[in-house]
């Protein structure tokens, strides 16, 4: 397939206007304007060491000590993040009645904070902590109090923000860091997110695929799609013959599957969604779409 690449928004606006049941797949690029760093460079490679795996977190106390120490320092800023123009634009798309589903790979809940309701958090949510033993859950804000209680002085450390709500703590020893256990059963507590090496819950995947089957097009926003758990939805859309557009700087894993690729700021490219739709423009776009179908 020959991909249409543009540096401007009109082609994307036309793509959106001619579809009524968009399946939107969002990634870390949506939240960078909210102060949350992304993971990948323009070639799709890691900007920093790969995140902790599920197996290491569950199997090694030292990994949990390092993870929760970094999280203790990084959480306050992450928890204060607020939706940006991209989140509000996608909420406006839903308000227009053109959204089938917003499937987000992000764990920050900023889409919901912006007003989006038809959202599935593919990789879970960082504002909840889950016991891997008894399945009890608690708010991350409540767990922060336990972390600070058991580790006085750590909250005062300064460090650069990292993508997973943690912080880049360098030259710090974690051996004496105390990781609180589940208050109910003494089990291992883990953020309620899907780690690398961990499976996305089947029910969540099946719900997302059901919405994909009802969609008439796919729009990828702020994702390189390098993680298979998100990429597989674009693969399925391509097999079904759905038009696919991507709004993302740099290479994506799906470049050869795209109908349209826009390399522009997400907020700038989607700004038209926060303006009243132009009936003539919309009608023209849908007319041309019907003729080409």
From Swiss-Prot:
Reactions that this protein is recorded to catalyse: N(6)-acetyl-L-lysyl-[protein] + NAD(+) + H2O = 2''-O-acetyl-ADP-D-ribose + nicotinamide + L-lysyl-[protein]
Keywords assigned: Cytoplasm, Metal-binding, NAD, Transferase, Zinc
Manner of cofactor binding, per the entry note: Binds 1 zinc ion per subunit.
Entry EC no(s): 2.3.1.286
Gene3D superfamilies named among the record's database cross-references: SIR2/SIRT2 'Small Domain, TPP-binding domain
Binding positions (NAD(+)): 27-47, 105-108, 222-224, 248-250, 266
Domain of life where this protein originates: Bacteria
Zinc recorded as keyword: yes
Cofactor needs: Zn(2+)
Pfam families on file: SIR2
Domain Deacetylase sirtuin-type: residue ranges: 1-284
Catalytic residues identified in the record: 123 (proton acceptor)
Cellular localisation: Cytoplasm
Any GO CC annotation of this UniProt entry: cytoplasm
UniProt-recorded Gene Ontology molecular function terms: histone deacetylase activity, NAD-dependent; NAD+ binding; zinc ion binding
Record function comment: NAD-dependent protein deacetylase which modulates the activities of several enzymes which are inactive in their acetylated form.
Annotated protein name in UniProt: NAD-dependent protein deacetylase
Higher taxonomy: Bacteria, Pseudomonadati, Pseudomonadota, Gammaproteobacteria, Lysobacterales
Gene that encodes the chain: cobB
